[in-house]
Amino acid sequence: MAIILGVDPGSRITGYGVIQCQGRQQIYLGSGCIRTSSDELPIRLKQIFEGLTEIIRQYQPEQFAIERVFMAKNADSALKLGQARGAAIVAATFADLPVAEYSATQIKSAVVGTGRAQKAQVQHMIQQLFKLPAAPQADAADALGVALCHYHTHQSLVAMGGRASSRTYGRYR
């Protein structure tokens, strides 16, 4: 049994999703968004760190997975996203959690079956997979997708006789 915290980082909105995995069963524990309130980036990064630290304290995950940075057209946006990822990763490492990272294409493939899925498709599949009464917010759905991707990748490695702690499955380097 493992509890996985998935994170979809953003400098304004950071989504999180927590699932518990038992064998082939994935159980929804919680999800939501950390919305930062300040225009000053250092304050927003602090809010992301503190928000995820509280989520980690509340759910006690054993594994942490985060979406990789994608190439943005705007360099300033890419830098801010990278800094938000850094705040999230520091929160995980402070809790001694192993950190894994996955591309958006890997995450969408794990959830929807195609790496080119739209956000609405990811939200719909997350709602169906976890039998939720309504689709979660886009950032929370993406974060749940990150957690599912991590679980499926972990299960595939174990099934192939690999080590679940292998650095080859998207571990942060």
From Swiss-Prot:
Its main location: cytoplasm. Homodimer which binds Holliday junction (HJ) DNA. The HJ becomes 2-fold symmetrical on binding to RuvC with unstacked arms; it has a different conformation from HJ DNA in complex with RuvA. In the full resolvosome a probable DNA-RuvA(4)-RuvB(12)-RuvC(2) complex forms which resolves the HJ. Its cofactor is Mg(2+). It is found in: Cytoplasm. This is Crossover junction endodeoxyribonuclease RuvC. NCBIfam families: ruvC. It comes from the Bacteria. Its EC number is 3.1.21.10. It holds the Pfam family RuvC. It catalyses: Endonucleolytic cleavage at a junction such as a reciprocal single-stranded crossover between two homologous DNA duplexes (Holliday junction). The active site is at 8, 67, 139. Mg(2+) 1 binds at residues 8, 139. The RuvA-RuvB-RuvC complex processes Holliday junction (HJ) DNA during genetic recombination and DNA repair. Endonuclease that resolves HJ intermediates. Cleaves cruciform DNA by making single-stranded nicks across the HJ at symmetrical positions within the homologous arms, yielding a 5'-phosphate and a 3'-hydroxyl group; requires a central core of homology in the junction. The consensus cleavage sequence is 5'-(A/T)TT(C/G)-3'. Cleavage occurs on the 3'-side of the TT dinucleotide at the point of strand exchange. GO terms for biological process: DNA recombination; DNA repair. GO terms for cellular component: cytoplasm; Holliday junction resolvase complex. Binds 2 Mg(2+) ion per subunit. Mg(2+) 2 binds at residue 67. The keyword rRNA-binding does not apply. GO terms for molecular function: crossover junction DNA endonuclease activity; DNA binding; magnesium ion binding. Keywords: Cytoplasm, DNA damage, DNA recombination, DNA repair, DNA-binding, Endonuclease, Hydrolase, Magnesium, Metal-binding, Nuclease. Belongs to the RuvC family.
